[in-house]
Amino acid sequence: MSNIYDSANELSRGLRGLPEYKTVKAAKDAIAADAEASKIFTEYLAFQEEIQKLAQTGQMPDASFQAKMEGFGKQIQGNSLLSEFFTKQQQLAIYLSDIEKIVFEPVSELLK
């Protein structure tokens, strides 16, 4: 029987080999090479982290967060590098969602 960690590492290597992963990586590299896109991306990630911290403490984002999110949405849609990155990331997320279902199936069976 193979070691479960070996299987997980093999899965990780497999994900990195997917064309969708490589496309997302290339899109992220393009963002890193562009000062404006990189700045917006970094600010967006910090904002997402702030929202996650609120959620973890049971707090709800207020109206200012909604306005800020809308602002980021406009900035992302207005920047072709960022827009492409998030589109490609969504395509990769389909694989991740499918894998998550497979991996957690044994756990969900225990809860039935």
Swiss-Prot record:
Pfam families: Com_YlbF (PF06133). Belongs to the UPF0342 family. It comes from Streptococcus pneumoniae (strain Taiwan19F-14). Gene3D superfamilies: YheA/YmcA-like. This is UPF0342 protein SPT_0901.
